[in-house]
Amino acid sequence: MVDDAGAAESQRGKQTPAHSLEQLRRLPLPPPQIRIRPWWFPVQELRDPLVFYLEAWLADELFGPDRAIIPEMEWTSQALLTVDIVDSGNLVEITVFGRPRVQNRVKSMLLCLAWFHREHRARAEKMKHLEKNLKAHASDPHSPQDPVA
């Protein structure tokens, strides 16, 4: 009896995945995200959306980690945007509602911003690699040093 109580006490600190899953199942579901169509957006423009995909990390860069920039983008572009995670978190599906010309303009703008962020990330990775190589080269005692005149 005492051993069972001690075992139970030691198990409280360590939760098994099944136990954690049961705790998650007991939690209430989050409320569904319901969006109301803005007053300035015509209903007929909801019929034919434009859909394209980007990497998930790019969506965080473009729209912010909590997608806080989307309402401002919608207001300035006069288009509605939805960003949904697909492919187990690797891709996001971006849906643009609005007039065809506006849809294409928003898609073009987002793809240009995505290109900029990809280039910025590639440059940052190259700089890290270069810094690592320079530090390794500077700490190598057998490397020839250029004389400073």
UniProtKB/Swiss-Prot annotation:
Pfam families: MOEP19. GO terms for biological process: actin filament organization; embryonic pattern specification; establishment of spindle localization; establishment or maintenance of apical/basal cell polarity; positive regulation of double-strand break repair; positive regulation of double-strand break repair via homologous recombination; positive regulation of meiotic nuclear division; protein storage. GO terms for cellular component: cell cortex; cytoplasm; cytoplasmic lattice; nucleus; protein-containing complex; subcortical maternal complex. Keywords: Cytoplasm, Nucleus. Its main location: cytoplasm. It is found in: Cytoplasm; Nucleus. Coiled coil: none annotated. Residues 49-110 form the KH domain. Residues 1-22 are annotated as: Disordered. One of its GO terms (molecular function) is RNA binding. It comes from the Eukaryota. Belongs to the KHDC1 family. Component of the subcortical maternal complex (SCMC), a multiprotein complex that plays a key role in early embryonic development. The SCMC complex is a structural constituent of cytoplasmic lattices, which consist in fibrous structures found in the cytoplasm of oocytes and preimplantation embryos. They are required to store maternal proteins critical for embryonic development, such as proteins that control epigenetic reprogramming of the preimplantation embryo, and prevent their degradation or activation. Contains an atypical KH domain with amino acid changes at critical sites, suggesting that it may not bind RNA. Component of the subcortical maternal complex (SCMC), at least composed of NLRP5, KHDC3L, OOEP, and TLE6 isoform 1. Within the complex, interacts with NLRP5, KHDC3L and TLE6 isoform 1. As part of the SCMC interacts with the SCMC-associated protein NLRP4F. The SCMC may facilitate translocation of its components between the nuclear and cytoplasmic compartments. Forms a scaffold complex with KHDC3L/FILIA, and interacts with BLM and TRIM25 at DNA replication forks. This is Oocyte-expressed protein homolog. It comes from Homo sapiens (Human).
